[in-house]
Amino acid sequence: PIPGAPKENTIMKTVLDAVALVGGENCSPNIVGVAVGGFGLDYTENLARKAIYREPLNSRHEDPQVAALEEKLFTAINNLGIGPIGVGGETTCLGLHMEIAGCHSAVFPIAVTFYCWSARYSRARIYQEGKVEFITHPELKEVIAHG
């Protein structure tokens, strides 16, 4: 989809090498953000972070070629067998989202970032009197109530 982009196998190898390198040290299973392209690595890293937050989890990119690559990467990561916290298993990756950007063909950055399980979020409204209303996970009301 991007003129001058690296071949799909280069992107696959880069992402899989990054996942294998960190193994379970990043509190897997993770959500993986991947960005390809951009005008500098800082931009590409931010784009990868943005990809992590796409909702809903595992929604695919609107470009069918990118969506197909997201699916291939997701499957390939889980086939590495790293598993939760690196002890082995089928679930290393809970989700993978990819973003792309144009860039000069002489420089083509690829960024991979991980969203650790402990960084997952919930939206809540905390009232002055101390009441907590969980917006994204209403079932947490029971956890708070029984402390």
Regions found by a protein language model. Name each.
Residues 1-147:
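Non-transmembrane, aqueous-exposed alpha-helical and coiled segments at domain scale
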